[in-house]
């Protein structure tokens, strides 16, 4: 669908209402009207179909097996045990008996059919969770450093992020009328949208809050990133980064991934003003003609960073202060038990590609249900698709450990290679309509194929960051990985190499459109050289750059590599 068509749909939607009520009530098809397929994204859902069944249904002269993905808005991925049980029940009753933790700390339900879509939405809201603005050309789910219970400063960070998420919600009542049966009032369909305006944003907008020295949110991959400045356990404010983004288009030199620019420091008091100024600047300056060039990163590159920063400061009425020093050490999760400053404990469990389901080998859904039934602590989703069981007293650890062992919830933590423990993948096939190749379903197989090579060179316990994406949109943030597979066609991938373990450097195309056999053949000699010639503590991506095997990619984003002067 063209940019002009989507802009027309948004502008004529009566503030995201469209004909959704009529589409939902139509019993003759499992699909929505075409324009409503665009609008339902703003309500937190995508219309999809099971691509594994497409050809067979076509032969039977049946319409595709339409279904819906629903995504929650859960800033920072924080939920209570009771909410977990309610989401578990929804997955079992309405979806495909699984919960999917996303790379933005949300949950996704897959396989919901149209006639049960409204009931599913109502059940999610009954859990005091919503899906509003989880998709669409608005601010998406706000990422936050994974565990706000580690310290008072982390708690303040989460509070700021949750406040900003609420501030940037659309003002329309369409969501509540369509899904929760709120009665229409005078002026419905004409509500003022003070932040978004009648056409909302040109494209999606992503925000992340990071707490050095850990960059688990990959803050520089966001349109807007906030890097916490914490001194003596007090959150003073944030370094502000703008213009990150992962999406690109295969073979199109006018599109590229980008890491964000640090533009200065703000105090906590200025968070809402600066965020509003940045979002409205993108609203007014972003490209609404060519959708593939509509993200904030292109607005910055087209108009110039100085121009955009000047506009932001003028709108906010704020002069940005010089950025404060910071250090990122890694962008992964710390598995196992960690003690917080309040002497409560937090257990991080690795989930392969974020999927929580019951299988013969790993009854993960049942296991987390058993922990939630204890009614203690909290659940925290991480930006690396893992789960933290947080806020556990010392006396409760043994009970948690027993359930972890009983249900094999630490299977991911015990994966045979460090690479497998830290790897990420997007959903891709069979539900994502954009997928060109497998990702989530392929990740375990690829890990198995790579394991003998890692063991051969003594690298099984060496952290190497692998990410797989089914298409170049990059939902698994593959362009920051040391090794990335980006889907090109069924069974074929672009092999990207040379990112780092701090989320600060993009990788480079190494081999294009190759098969698994070719991927493994390309990686083996490089891993062998890495084993022989790496420096102490040197990551794989850093090694590839130091030895000249990989250079920075040719697109303009690397004008914006993070300045070493800010690395304290």
Curated annotation (Swiss-Prot):
The protein's required cofactors: siroheme; [4Fe-4S] cluster
Organism superkingdom: Bacteria
Homology family: Belongs to the nitrite and sulfite reductase 4Fe-4S domain family.
Entries under PANTHER family matching the protein: SULFITE REDUCTASE [NADPH] SUBUNIT BETA (PTHR11493:SF47), SULFITE REDUCTASE [NADPH] SUBUNIT BETA-RELATED (PTHR11493)
Function field: Component of the sulfite reductase complex that catalyzes the 6-electron reduction of sulfite to sulfide. This is one of several activities required for the biosynthesis of L-cysteine from sulfate.
NCBIfam families assigned: CysI, PRK13504.1
Name of protein: Sulfite reductase [NADPH] hemoprotein beta-component
Source species of the chain: Xylella fastidiosa (strain 9a5c)
Gene name as annotated: cysI
